[in-house]
Amino acid sequence: MSHPSWLPPKSTGEPLGHVPARMETTHSFGNPSISVSTQQPPKKYAPVVAPKPKYNPYKQPGGEGDLLPPPPPPLEDPGTIPPGPGHFPPPPPLDEGAFKVQQGNPGGKTLEERRSSLDAEIDSLTSILADLECSSPYKPRPPQGSASSIASPPVSTPVTGHKRMVIPQQPPLTATKKSATKPQPAPQAAPIPVTPIGTLKPQPQPVPASYTTASTSSRPTFNVQVKSAQPSPHYMAGPSSGQIYGPGPRGYNNQPVPVSGQCPPPPTCVGTDYAYIPPSGHPPESGYGYTSNQGRYYEPYYAAGPSYGGRSEGDTAYGQQVQPNTWKREAAYAPPASGNQNHPGMYPVSGPKKTYITDPVSAPCAPPLQPKGGYPGPMGPPSIPPSFRPEDELEHLTKKMLYDMENPPADDYFGRCARCGENVVGEGTGCTAMDQVFHVDCFTCIVCDVKLRGQPFYAVEKKAYCEPCYINTLEQCSVCSKPIMERILRATGKAYHPHCFTCVMCHRSLDGIPFTVDACGLIHCIEDFHKKFAPRCSVCKEPIMPAPGQEETVRIVALDRDFHVHCYRCEDCGGLLSEGDNQGCYPLDGHILCKTCNSARIRVLTAKASTDL
């Protein structure tokens, strides 16, 4: 920017009165198997008991103390039925001191009669299985007479062979059948003696038991209930009124398995306070299963080796010495260790297997446990896998409880407090802010320590401030002296609110608009600055400003006066003056004249002077 300046006249060779003009240019400013159990209508068949390989079926009577299992019901002509060939292996070596079991029915039956009864029972059960497999499991069978007698072949026709039942390999279960009778006190219950037999080597692993059947004449007939065996956790009997207990090889009271139309109560897996909740299925209908109203009957289970029924290794092996009056709780069934392992005297194992009145087989792991206080401590021993003892299970639970106490579950652990460095544990004890976890007591203002949970706060460099403390840290506007809460506009080393940064002349906001500052530090827009400080034309008296769209100011300086380009004219003729020879400025007595007008004025003045002389 240039201020107007006047130049003195020069003494040149030009004609008198010619005034040269000077033109100046000024720059402007400038974002994650249903198990179906089908019950058939009541149908009475021959009673069957659990397989008890405690006697030798080929043992001939005659020795002292050689007693046989309970005989079947008497037949009209038992001598006409010869034994079935090839159904049993050669008898093991005899051991008179192996063990003794008392006989419940000391009737004098021959071996042929018992074999005939066994053959008849096998045929009867085979026909039942064939019927059930051929018919639809969801189609009800027509009811039959409830007083049907024991199915047996005609006594006049000898039985020469048996139909072999096809038994599946998975899951291997034993055939178990229980009868119902009146429960009697333990001292009056007479165990059934069995003839001592030879000793076999204990089997280290459980194997499927053969379908050996027997019948007793002193027990009433009962219905047959068939279930499809599905893998599921152990089912153990709970204590109930009327059940009979006897001494067992374990350290706690052995509970016989109850027999009823419904599933027995589930066992405990880890202690007396938990029980397995079985999967939901079709509950047994009334009228099915056992119809005896004489109360539950608990059949004694004689000690046997681990190869029958999946007993643990701690039980007495087959052929070892046991007490005659030993009653044993029936254990849950476990699958065999090898796929096709058969015991001598068994039927071959293949295809799907079905069993009679069997508890579900044990699964490798039990479902989640739920608290249950139905069993007292000594009356409800826990059902645990064979590899765990009760002491080991208790120690395992104790260690787990201590670990859970020292290491809370992941659901209650939220992380480490960013303020104090301690763990944030428990619902309602912590909060999350600025992508960090804090204790409720630790999440406070960094200045005044007021708690900020549920309150608005301001985060500055990972530090929390309450609103008053945050406002106090803000810069103040240079115009209104108030804290700047939003966007800050900085100019000339000062902070402004965007709406406070305005021109002092027109009071228009200069946010995003070019501006300039005068010598006093006052802010002006470009237009108002030129209006206030630009030189003014000596003709029109208006400020000389840049043309629209231009950044430079063009002015003419002559006789120390400033002119707009369009205002620089001859005062007499009004002709536009320029730097040309004939268009130059020839001032006369302070007037801006062209050469012609200047000459005319000079002649007039000369003539007047001559007249005066």
Curated annotation (Swiss-Prot):
Residue numbers carrying N6-acetyllysine: 109
Matches recorded under Gene3D superfamilies: Cysteine Rich Protein
Phosphotyrosine found at: 245, 302
Cell compartments where the protein resides: Nucleus; Cytoplasm; Cell junction
List of residues that carry Phosphoserine: 117, 152
Cellular component GO terms, alphabetical: cytosol; focal adhesion; nucleus; plasma membrane
Polar residues bias spans: 26-40, 210-231
Sequence segments annotated as region (Disordered): 1-119, 133-259
Positions where Omega-N-methylarginine occurs in the chain: 250
A biological-process GO annotation: cell adhesion
InterPro entries: Znf_LIM
Gene Ontology molecular-function annotations: metal ion binding
UniProt function note: May play a structural role at sites of cell adhesion in maintaining cell shape and motility. In addition to these structural functions, it may also be implicated in signaling events and activation of gene transcription. May be involved in signal transduction from cell adhesion sites to the nucleus allowing successful integration of signals arising from soluble factors and cell-cell adhesion sites. Also suggested to serve as a scaffold protein upon which distinct protein complexes are assembled in the cytoplasm and in the nucleus.
Quaternary data: Interacts with VASP, with PDZ domains of SCRIB and with ACTN1/alpha-actinin.
Name of this protein: Lipoma-preferred partner homolog
Organism, scientific name: Mus musculus
